[in-house]
Amino acid sequence: MSSSKRIAKELSDLERDPPTSCSAGPVGDDLYHWQASIMGPADSPYAGGVFFLSIHFPTDYPFKPPKISFTTKIYHPNINANGNICLDILKDQWSPALTLSKVLLSICSLLTDANPDDPLVPEIAHIYKTDRPKYEATAREWTKKYAV
Protein backbone atom coordinates (compact mmCIF):
# COMPACT_ATOMS: atom_id res chain seq x y z
CA MET A 1 0.00 0.00 0.00
CA SER A 2 1.43 3.40 -0.95
CA SER A 3 1.85 6.10 1.67
CA SER A 4 -0.91 8.23 0.11
CA LYS A 5 -3.37 5.29 0.19
CA ARG A 6 -2.50 4.60 3.83
CA ILE A 7 -2.92 8.28 4.77
CA ALA A 8 -6.26 8.46 2.91
CA LYS A 9 -7.45 5.34 4.76
CA GLU A 10 -6.46 6.84 8.12
CA LEU A 11 -8.32 10.04 7.20
CA SER A 12 -11.51 8.13 6.42
CA ASP A 13 -11.15 6.10 9.65
CA LEU A 14 -10.67 9.33 11.64
CA GLU A 15 -13.74 10.92 10.05
CA ARG A 16 -15.83 7.81 10.71
CA ASP A 17 -14.63 7.21 14.26
CA PRO A 18 -12.82 10.27 15.67
CA PRO A 19 -10.83 9.78 18.88
CA THR A 20 -12.22 11.52 21.96
CA SER A 21 -11.24 15.19 22.22
CA CYS A 22 -9.04 15.13 19.08
CA SER A 23 -9.57 15.99 15.45
CA ALA A 24 -7.27 16.03 12.44
CA GLY A 25 -7.34 16.47 8.71
CA PRO A 26 -5.37 17.69 5.70
CA VAL A 27 -4.45 21.34 5.22
CA GLY A 28 -6.00 22.20 1.85
CA ASP A 29 -5.40 19.47 -0.72
CA ASP A 30 -2.05 18.30 0.68
CA LEU A 31 -2.55 14.78 2.01
CA TYR A 32 0.95 14.87 3.57
CA HIS A 33 0.37 18.01 5.68
CA TRP A 34 -2.37 17.95 8.31
CA GLN A 35 -3.52 20.07 11.17
CA ALA A 36 -4.85 18.52 14.36
CA SER A 37 -6.50 19.89 17.46
CA ILE A 38 -6.52 18.43 20.94
CA MET A 39 -8.83 19.56 23.72
CA GLY A 40 -6.98 19.98 27.01
CA PRO A 41 -7.98 16.99 29.20
CA ALA A 42 -10.48 17.91 31.94
CA ASP A 43 -8.32 16.40 34.69
CA SER A 44 -5.23 18.41 33.71
CA PRO A 45 -4.02 22.02 34.01
CA TYR A 46 -4.71 22.26 30.25
CA ALA A 47 -8.50 21.91 30.72
CA GLY A 48 -10.49 24.41 28.67
CA GLY A 49 -7.70 24.88 26.14
CA VAL A 50 -7.62 23.88 22.49
CA PHE A 51 -4.15 23.02 21.24
CA PHE A 52 -3.28 22.94 17.55
CA LEU A 53 -0.64 20.68 16.05
CA SER A 54 1.04 20.49 12.68
CA ILE A 55 1.51 17.03 11.17
CA HIS A 56 3.84 16.19 8.28
CA PHE A 57 3.78 12.65 6.92
CA PRO A 58 7.02 11.41 5.33
CA THR A 59 6.77 9.92 1.82
CA ASP A 60 7.75 6.54 3.30
CA TYR A 61 4.91 6.58 5.88
CA PRO A 62 4.03 4.33 7.72
CA PHE A 63 7.59 3.00 7.80
CA LYS A 64 8.73 6.30 9.29
CA PRO A 65 6.74 8.25 11.90
CA PRO A 66 4.92 11.49 11.11
CA LYS A 67 6.58 14.71 12.27
CA ILE A 68 4.20 16.30 14.76
CA SER A 69 4.62 19.58 16.59
CA PHE A 70 2.43 21.86 18.68
CA THR A 71 1.68 25.20 17.00
CA THR A 72 -0.04 26.43 20.17
CA LYS A 73 2.37 27.39 22.96
CA ILE A 74 2.16 24.99 25.90
CA TYR A 75 3.97 24.73 29.24
CA HIS A 76 5.01 21.08 29.50
CA PRO A 77 8.24 19.20 30.33
CA ASN A 78 7.98 17.04 27.19
CA ILE A 79 7.12 19.82 24.70
CA ASN A 80 9.61 22.59 23.94
CA ALA A 81 9.25 26.20 22.78
CA ASN A 82 9.34 25.09 19.13
CA GLY A 83 6.43 22.73 19.78
CA ASN A 84 8.57 19.60 19.45
CA ILE A 85 7.22 16.63 21.39
CA CYS A 86 9.32 14.11 23.30
CA LEU A 87 7.28 10.93 22.86
CA ASP A 88 8.87 7.52 22.30
CA ILE A 89 6.37 6.41 19.63
CA LEU A 90 7.32 9.42 17.49
CA LYS A 91 10.95 8.30 17.64
CA ASP A 92 12.52 4.90 18.32
CA GLN A 93 9.29 3.15 19.40
CA TRP A 94 7.44 3.95 16.17
CA SER A 95 5.76 1.02 14.47
CA PRO A 96 3.91 0.91 11.11
CA ALA A 97 1.01 -0.68 13.02
CA LEU A 98 0.43 2.64 14.82
CA THR A 99 -2.09 5.08 13.38
CA LEU A 100 -2.37 8.83 13.69
CA SER A 101 -5.44 8.29 15.86
CA LYS A 102 -3.37 6.27 18.38
CA VAL A 103 -0.59 8.88 18.27
CA LEU A 104 -3.04 11.72 19.03
CA LEU A 105 -4.44 9.74 21.97
CA SER A 106 -0.88 9.23 23.25
CA ILE A 107 -0.23 12.97 23.02
CA CYS A 108 -3.51 13.56 24.91
CA SER A 109 -2.42 11.24 27.69
CA LEU A 110 0.98 12.98 27.81
CA LEU A 111 -0.92 16.15 28.75
CA THR A 112 -2.47 14.31 31.70
CA ASP A 113 0.65 12.34 32.66
CA ALA A 114 3.88 14.14 31.82
CA ASN A 115 7.11 12.14 31.72
CA PRO A 116 9.56 14.31 33.71
CA ASP A 117 12.23 11.58 33.57
CA ASP A 118 12.61 12.03 29.80
CA PRO A 119 12.16 15.79 29.49
CA LEU A 120 12.65 18.04 26.50
CA VAL A 121 12.62 21.04 28.86
CA PRO A 122 14.63 20.10 32.00
CA GLU A 123 13.68 23.32 33.86
CA ILE A 124 9.96 22.55 33.57
CA ALA A 125 10.59 18.91 34.53
CA HIS A 126 12.42 20.10 37.65
CA ILE A 127 9.48 22.31 38.69
CA TYR A 128 7.07 19.45 37.87
CA LYS A 129 9.00 17.17 40.23
CA THR A 130 9.76 19.64 43.04
CA ASP A 131 6.84 22.10 43.05
CA ARG A 132 3.79 20.55 41.36
CA PRO A 133 1.38 23.38 42.39
CA LYS A 134 3.67 25.96 40.72
CA TYR A 135 3.91 23.80 37.59
CA GLU A 136 0.12 23.41 37.41
CA ALA A 137 -0.49 27.13 38.01
CA THR A 138 1.93 28.08 35.22
CA ALA A 139 0.47 25.48 32.85
CA ARG A 140 -3.05 26.84 33.57
CA GLU A 141 -1.83 30.40 33.00
CA TRP A 142 -0.27 29.51 29.62
CA THR A 143 -3.41 27.59 28.65
CA LYS A 144 -5.58 30.67 29.35
CA LYS A 145 -3.11 32.93 27.54
CA TYR A 146 -2.43 30.87 24.41
CA ALA A 147 -5.05 28.11 24.04
CA VAL A 148 -8.42 29.65 24.89
From Swiss-Prot:
Residues covered by the UBC core domain: 2-148
- Bias (Basic and acidic residues) occurs at 7-18
Partners and quaternary state? Interacts with TUL1.
**What's the protein name?**
Ubiquitin-conjugating enzyme E2 4
Q: Where is this cross-link: Glycyl lysine isopeptide (Lys-Gly) (interchain with G-Cter in ubiquitin)?
A: K91
Task performed by this protein: E2 ubiquitin-conjugating enzyme that catalyzes the covalent attachment of ubiquitin to other proteins. Mediates the selective degradation of short-lived and abnormal proteins. Mediates ubiquitination of PEX5.
Q: From what superkingdom does this record's organism come?
A: Eukaryota
Q: Which PANTHER family match?
A: UBIQUITIN-CONJUGATING ENZYME E2
In which organism is this protein found?
A: Saccharomyces cerevisiae (strain ATCC 204508 / S288c)
